[in-house]
Amino acid sequence: MFTRVSSFVDTVWSGITKPSDDDYNIVTTPTAGRSSSRAGKDFAVSLALFQALCLLFFALKFNMPSPKNNDVDTKSTLSYYGMYMDVHVMIYIGFGFLMTFLRKYSMSAVSLNFLIAVLSLQWGIITVTMSHQIMGNHHTTKILDIPTMINGDFAAGAVLISFGAVLGKATPTQLVWMTFFEIIFYSINEYIVLEELKATDAGGSMVIHTFGAFFGLAVTIALGVPSSDEQVHNTSRYDSDVFAMIGTLFLWMYWPSFNSALVNEDGFQKERAIMTTVFSIAASCASAFAATKVLSYSKKFDMVHLQNATLAGGVASGTCCNLAISPAAAITVGLVVGIASVVGYTFVTPRLEMIMRMSDTCGILNLHAMPGLVGGLAGALITFTASDDYYGDSLTDVYAARAYRSVTAQGWYQLLAIVSSMGIGSVSGLIVGLFLRSSWFRQHKHKYDDKEWFHMPEVCEV
């Protein structure tokens, strides 16, 4: 069966792909042509299989809401739509443009971000729903709603964070398979953290950012460090940095919606989540500007720091955004992670690249891993110290397990959630990374360069 599919794809591919040597400014040999054709076929088959699997699951296990199968008030789910679209903007525009900083990889960055997001959205809805049904031992048709769609975008966020670590080094085919496997492990960790440990993590500091970052870092370690010759295009230029800053601004504006999208309105939780995120991300922006001026080697503003460290407060406030936190505490969290992120970009990442042979293209260690850990720790600290009276009747809505757990026990479970996200992310990322490095996959020949996979209408040497 697979041979017939492959033969059909070969026939179609040979008819529609005849690359011109002029488009690439390189000499094409028969071997190179066959290699390119095979790479294109592998990608098309992988993508077709992935989408077909999603179609099969949606046909068998999901249905649209109707008066016959759903008695939930329509207004109660449509109230999530505004937040859903804000999260959508972050996933497709924010993340997409944030990754366009590489001077010769902007087309790939924004386009592959688009592809990964749409695959993750579908597969995330399926796997998160299935993990809850399998573990909960209730196998029924899932009636879709807007919160479920938001969970799909959250899953996409985790994969796009990992994408940042391998940006420019993994082929589109490898990225399709990375997405497929990562979403499965993401769903397992999400179920463990939220359902087994009963930890609270409204904005995903642990489930999304910590997991996605450690998964991506493990994958990039497994793939190895590009040679000095391959690193030649791992740089930015004036216009690519400006485009990346557009992504930063979209992410910065909509992060309060991301953190509060699924927060319940009872007990002023959603209001707290929005305001905590605003204060924290504003503070991280201010401290990042100050830190880059002081710590950068040229004593000037570094666009890498401004594009990324300014967002660290949004990541760090994810777990604690709807908890008993004051404005001053939220600002303190933002100030700390803004400075720490700049320190990471300036001093930590270069040393880790030498010691651990880790090539982190977007610096997700400093934007997602470290702030995610700080956010998880902040959530645990608040859990240990906050009074139950603060939450009133909404206590068990914030902490589902507090109906039978002490405050101390809940704090320890919050810490276990951090360990789970780090551990599952690291181990699964290493396994998937070794799989992607195997002989089953063609490796990226022209790293950080669009020309290997994209038609280049006009080639400019910059």
Where are these regions (language model features)?
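Hydrophobic alpha-helical transmembrane bundles of multi-pass membrane proteins
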Residues: 2-462
